[in-house]
Amino acid sequence: HYIYAFDNVAFPYGEKSEEFIVERVVEIVTAVQQRYPLALAVIACNTASTVSLPALREKFAFPVVGVVPAIKPAARLTANGIVGLLATRGTVKRPYTRELIDRFANECRIEMLGSAELVELAEAKLHGEPVPLEELRRILRPW
């Protein structure tokens, strides 16, 4: 059995403080855990994962895994030594992301673009809403 919890109240997390994100994610996982017996929690958000995993792992006895930017495989697979990272501004600026780059991609040129708007457009697309191509072009123009 799987339970999917989405925080549509505080979404997106990319512009929120680390303290807010940790408190919010711990609060949500606690609420779910009180209603359902959890064997594992997956934090399926780069921003939330990069800041909340230590607190979650300390609080809960079940395993907690997260998703983080795929720097390691991207660095291994790039043909030209350039890796692009599209993420929230929070993920782009967090020390955890820099540590991934230093550890796994120090020979690569990493081009990062942080945008809350991309998150909102991706979620809109998942809900079947149209995503204007011109809007994507505007957001990606700095790249």
Question: Where are the regions a protein language model picked out?
Answer:
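Non-catalytic structural scaffold of enzyme domains
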Residues: 1-143
